[in-house]
Swiss-Prot record:
Residues bound to NAD(+): 7-13, 34, 94, 117-119, 227
Name of the featured protein: Malate dehydrogenase
Similarity comment: Belongs to the LDH/MDH superfamily. MDH type 1 family.
Active site: 177 (proton acceptor)
Assembly, per entry: Homodimer.
Role played: Catalyzes the reversible oxidation of malate to oxaloacetate.
Family annotation (Pfam families): Ldh_1_C, Ldh_1_N
Reaction catalyzed: (S)-malate + NAD(+) = oxaloacetate + NADH + H(+)
E.C. designation(s): 1.1.1.37
Protein keywords: NAD, Oxidoreductase, Tricarboxylic acid cycle
Gene Ontology process terms (BP): malate metabolic process; tricarboxylic acid cycle
Amino acid sequence: MKVAVLGAAGGIGQALSLLLKTQLPAGTELALYDVAPVVPGVAVDLSHIPTDVKVEGFGKDDLAKALTGSDIVLIPAGVPRKPGMDRSDLFNINAGIVRNLVDSVADNCPEACLCIITNPVNTTVAIAAEALKAKGVYNKNKLFGVTTLDVIRAETFVGNLRDLNPANVHVPVIGGHSGTTILPLLSQVEGVEFTDEEVASLTTRIQNAGTEVVEAKAGGGSATLSMGQAAARFCLSLVSAMRGENVVEYTYVETNSDDAQFFSHPVRLGKNGVEEILPYGELSDFEQKAKESMLEGLRGDIKLGVEFVNN
């Protein structure tokens, strides 16, 4: 199996690559690509870690080589958020980066599972879909927006609030991957009851957790380490599923639902990517209202991505 990370020299890319080097199954190839000249050094650095995962670095002229034969491609490339910016401010820069990388994926490994990490995910996944359609290789079962960070944050915050081990807490998070489009289903957390005030404050904190990190880093970056962990978790789940294990993860995929063209759902993963999009269950009144009020914004984010490629 071969996994490629595009944008491997950045904050998320390096954290993600480290976790994959230490956790991918023995015999996996890990291809690290970046336009930054440091990327061969990142690969050499990681190659000194004693695991049976072969790491190779590829510079800006070697994208095709990095992608050829890849089974999974992860894209964290792009510029990070700075204080005062929201994820939509990133669109102007990151949209073009994602478009170019996805075009190369279409040309060199069209069968690969493609995992989009670059923000704004609500929009960049739509860009990826349209770019793949334009090349005639779109398979909706193989395109994922990585929203796992919202899930691990929700599990951490609930665990901390109730003094539980977050590793044993399961919080469904549906919708999109920015602001109010992030919808944690706290009514479905097993064995834990919340007051209305707790639901409101937890929901707001989960939705604004990215900003919490950006502000805490005081201009020094965004959520790179936790995002690296979230992306690694999703990638490793996908690897396990491709090897025949039964795995469910929440991820932003194309759906046939009335909610939006793309929506984060619980998804059963398998050898060919999406095996089955599972229902997200019954919503509380609070969650139903929150969902209804954010759908227009989410649909607008998606439309922006579709129009970016087609206009």
